[in-house]
Curated annotation (Swiss-Prot):
Domain of life, per lineage: Bacteria
Organism whose genome encodes this protein: Thermomicrobium roseum (strain ATCC 27502 / DSM 5159 / P-2)
Record text on subunit structure and interactions: Homodimer.
A single GO molecular function term of this UniProt record: pyridoxal phosphate binding
Organism lineage: Bacteria, Pseudomonadati, Thermomicrobiota, Thermomicrobia, Thermomicrobiales
Keyword entries, A-Z: Cytoplasm, Isomerase, Porphyrin biosynthesis, Pyridoxal phosphate
Protein name: Glutamate-1-semialdehyde 2,1-aminomutase
Family: Belongs to the class-III pyridoxal-phosphate-dependent aminotransferase family. HemL subfamily.
HAMAP family named among the record's database cross-references: HemL_aminotrans_3
Length: 430
């Protein structure tokens, strides 16, 4: 196949895909740029169709804990593909990955693999409604749980990036079954349970919000959710599609010491291949077909290639010192960015949990969707363009997380800090 350049590929893509892309944020519209057309990844670097190398902090939106094309993952995949690409039957590879997940994630006793994070949250919500006999689901403004109809109401990620209140096509009936509250607002949650507690099937939450930028939970917020759901007989669902195996082997629930009833996973557990999973207490998961009446199925669920890539990634994650190294590199990056912000005189903040972080152009820290929406998107766009011009690839939205991978090195962090110093100075000059 003759390789076209980025410009011609972008022209062709617009002929075939809505907006030229298969996921909206990839269009780079929020930063006023043409998209990066990726053809290859090597460690912490991504190479576009014109041969330009970018130091990558998108990392496939957090899926690439080990970086691009890690030799261990590639070797395992090369072996696996010789055995077949899909069976549609039980295989040892899904058993091995499930064993690793159950051994690592405190709240998961049984797990079901699906093909995406969206499928995971959709299936968890269905299960919660079935076992409680209730319809109402509580979510938080700015938290994104995939493109499930009922969870797109006041969502984060691309919905927030493009300034959309929700999306057409979601019926009023579906929206009525979703109660949207401010993230980190314990009082609002308490009021909701006081008024609607008997109708609430579940509360679904990103334990660390990653889709309005990185927003950590306020002290006591997650524990209060746990108390209120338990008292009301509702389920607590942690959407750990981003944080699962990103913040540690046990994810956010281990980091904060709060155990949900159900957990949704994705991204890292597929090692860069399509995957999702939901799991939780045995008594709940036993209600999923074929053991129970809650139906859910998928032709490619437990796909052997995804399972092998995920298991290879988790093998790397279990090596001694891995999460300590990620923490050290990300903290180093945060400190360097904060120093450059201070030098620039710009109103900006860096928020980080583990190896995920965001630089917000804001007068105050971001604690919820409302404060996220006050951020200066024009300044972020200028910053993004200046960083890209220096070969640093950031998410093309202020409301997406940056990710540090195992492939990033100290010299990469230093290079990023120096590039940010120049970019922020350029933004400050206007």
């Amino acid at each position: 196949m003759m390789m076209e350049n980025s410009g011609s590929l972008w022209d062709a893509a617009r002929q075939f895909f809505p907006g030229g892309v298969n996921s909206p944020v990839r269009a780079f519209r929020a930063v006023g740029e043409e998209p990066v057309v990726a053809v290859r990844g090597e460690g912490a670097y991504l190479i576009d169709a014109d041969g330009r190398r970018f130091l990558d902090y998108i990392c496939s939106w957090g899926a690439l804990l080990a970086g691009h094309a890690h030799p261990h993952v590639v070797d395992r995949l090369s072996e696996a593909i010789q055995r077949g690409t899909s069976f549609g039957l039980l295989s040892p590879y899904e058993v091995e990955l499930a064993r690793a997940i159950v051994a690592s994630v405190p709240a998961i006793e049984l797990v079901r693999f699906v093909n995406s994070g969206t499928e995971a949250t959709m299936s968890a919500i269905r299960l919660a409604r079935a076992v409680t006999g209730r319809n109402l689901v509580v979510k938080f403004a700015g938290c994104y749980h995939g493109h499930v109809d009922g969870l797109l109401v006041a969502a984060g990620s691309g919905v927030l990036t493009f300034g959309l209140p929700g999306t057409p096509g979601v019926t009023e009936g579906t929206a009525r079954d979703t109660l949207v509250l401010p993230y980190n607002d314990q009082e609002a949650v308490e009021d909701a349970f006081a008024q609607h507690g008997e109708r609430i099937a579940a509360v679904i939450v990103e334990p660390v919000a990653g889709n309005m930028g990185v927003v950590p939970p306020a002290a006591g917020f997650l524990s209060r959710l746990r108390e209120l759901t338990r008292q009301a007989g509702a389920l607590l669902i942690f959407d750990e599609v981003i944080t699962g195996f990103r913040l540690g082997l046990g994810g956010a629930q281990e980091r904060f010491g709060i155990l949900p009833d159900l957990t949704c996973l994705g991204k890292v557990i597929g090692g860069g291949l399509p995957v999702g999973a939901y799991g939780g207490r045995r008594d709940l998961m036993e209600q999923v077909a074929p053991n129970g009446p809650v139906y859910q199925a998928g032709t490619l669920a437990g796909n052997p290639l995804s399972m092998v890539a995920g298991l290879a990634t988790l093998e790397l994650a279990r090596e001694p010192g891995v999460y300590g190294r990620l923490e050290t590199l990300a903290a180093w990056l945060q400190r360097g960015l904060e120093e450059t912000i201070q030098e620039s005189g710009l109103p900006a903040h860096v928020q980080r949990v583990g190896s995920m972080l965001t630089l917000f152009f804001s007068q105050q820290p971001v604690t919820d969707a409302q404060t996220a929406e006050r951020c200066d998107t024009a300044r972020f766009a200028a910053f993004h363009r200046a960083m890209r011009a220096q070969g640093i690839l950031l998410p093309p939205s202020q409301f997406e997380a940056w990710f540090v991978s195992l492939a990033h090195r100290e010299e990469d962090i230093d290079r990023t800090i120096e590039a940010a110093r120049k970019a922020l100075a350029e933004v400050a000059r206007g």
